[in-house]
Amino acid sequence: MIVPDLVADAMTAGPPAAKSGDGATMFGQVSDLGPGTVLAVETARDGVPTAWIAPTSLRAVVGMLREPAAALRMLFDLTAIDERQRAHRVGQPDCAFTLVCHFMALGGAGDALRLKVPLPAEAPRVPSIADFWPNANWYEREVWDLFGITFEGHPFLRRILTPPTWTGHPLRKDHYARATEMPPYSLTEDQEMAEQQALRFDPGAWGMARHSAHSDFMFLNLGPNHPSVHGVFRIVLQLEGERIVDAVPDIGFHHRGAEKMGERQSWHSFIPYTDRVDYLGGVMNNFPYVMAVEKLAGITVPPRAQMIRVMLAELFRVASHLVFYGTMTQDVGQLSPVFYMFSDRERVFEIIEAICGFRMHPAWFRIGGVAMDLPRGWDGLIRDFLDYLPPRLDEYEKMVMRNPIFRARTIGVGAYDVSEAIAWGVTGPGLRACGLEWDLRRKVPYSGYDQLEFDIPTAQNGDCYDRVRVHIAEIRQSLRIIRQCLDGMPAGAIKAEHRLTTPPPRARTMHDIETLIHHFLSVSWGPVIPPGEAHACVEATKGLNSYHLISDGGTMSYRTRIRTPSFPHLQMIPLISRGGMIADLIAIIGSIDFVMADVDR
């Protein structure tokens, strides 16, 4: 009797209307192609217009959306859904798998279009679109790796997140999710040799020549345990002397199935897992996840909780950018700054620990609000830090950004322009360093960012130096935002008065046996979220981070898609390193600002 009430309560808020702007224009372009191309139309709870198109029409539709390039349209994400166990599919074409392409227009207010392609259970296949959007290359490899969907015409369709010897496709519903579901593991000597052999790099398999007209090429493994690659990450370099001819990034060593875990945890208990994706981002990882759940549930977050979320997220942005700043200087040979900046980061963690109880991974956001109210004395801690850090940043400006050696190592190195950034799916500071003033907090404001005053730092050259400059300027803008949160923190509730708020406010749970049962079910089973799908995106520390969640009317997500900024950013390494030296590559890697858990999930 209780569970249906929870569902009915959440379903009172219908899906929002489709947005206008370039997203509607893209949708209109697709709709004009006629019924032979568009199989169905739907609007998800996030309001993103969605068109189902036939597999044979995919390239024609994508090619049309690619032009004109001046429209600043980005292939934001490409993923898939295993529909075979999904119960609620009203109005959707019958299929076993769905390919999902998410497009975003950066020329205006960030409007979006979602294309879906229905695919059969046996030998699902679609044509590759990597020649239209180069960032589709890795996304298509990921979909083939995890779902077994073949992309015809893809130049190098091979596993990317799982080992080359892996059997099966992990995000299919019939694939095991835990080691306890697998046979006991054993590794014979022959299997060990086969695993080692599978890791050997074959240049011919990647279309790489072994010789030039003048010399033999050397192939060098940089990583997976080199300190300059910032994690377990391998780049195979094709070298002529010390000059880089080409590079092949090899990722997946950190992959631990975060999206698969989302199908086994309750909506509430998955929150701590989000912290571990970008492990330097803390609650910034919670942000898009809880926003997506709140869209599905129809929850409106109180103003005080929204402001607290923004303040904590910006504190973590400062902490993450300080790590980037210090490690970047260390990568190019300066040893002192990293110690100063990590000391400053400790001050941020002292504030976060005082508010949240934990430092790096507080898992502090909740569905409908935050875990608890601000403690006594929080404002004094933050005010002291806001006075402390700006003079330190001034010192770092003299120490690092005006240093002639640092400038020589970074100016003009690893440069790309706006069109290349959009084609490769670059967002965040890496995009703004090219000169495009586009920040989701300003263009598509969420959680009250539209009530705050801040600038969008940009640069012009898109090189290593400018990427560092933008990060530094963003620290100052984050301090500006935090000060406004400090001075304008509203009074009121920290959780929404909604039956799907999890955990529910304690005042609502101690009245009688009925309210106690609601509390017990909400905490033990988790909230029952009504059927639907929703996408939520935030301007995270390294770029745009989004969650696309599908509910089938249960206590767990049917599909959890995590789109991280670091994944497409690393894909650009070959483009911006060709012709450079190995020392230049070290600076390029440091300037991208990534962590491998954010890449591999």
From Swiss-Prot:
It comes from Gluconacetobacter diazotrophicus (strain ATCC 49037 / DSM 5601 / CCUG 37298 / CIP 103539 / LMG 7603 / PAl5). This is NADH-quinone oxidoreductase subunit C/D. Its main location: membrane. It catalyses: a quinone + NADH + 5 H(+)(in) = a quinol + NAD(+) + 4 H(+)(out). GO terms for molecular function: NAD binding; NADH dehydrogenase (ubiquinone) activity; NADH:ubiquinone reductase (non-electrogenic) activity; quinone binding. It is an enzyme of class 7 (translocase). In the N-terminal section; belongs to the complex I 30 kDa subunit family. NDH-1 shuttles electrons from NADH, via FMN and iron-sulfur (Fe-S) centers, to quinones in the respiratory chain. The immediate electron acceptor for the enzyme in this species is believed to be ubiquinone. Couples the redox reaction to proton translocation (for every two electrons transferred, four hydrogen ions are translocated across the cytoplasmic membrane), and thus conserves the redox energy in a proton gradient. Its EC number is 7.1.1.-. NDH-1 is composed of 13 different subunits. Subunits NuoB, CD, E, F, and G constitute the peripheral sector of the complex. Signal peptide: none annotated. It is found in: Cell inner membrane. Residues 1-192 are annotated as: NADH dehydrogenase I subunit C. It is a peripheral membrane protein. It comes from the Bacteria. InterPro entries: NADH_DH_suCD, NADH_Q_OxRdtase_suD, NADH_quin_OxRdtase_su_C/D-like, NADH_UbQ_OxRdtase_30kDa_su, NADH_UbQ_OxRdtase_49kDa_CS, NADH_UbQ_OxRdtase_CS, NDH1_su_D/H, NiFe-Hase_large.
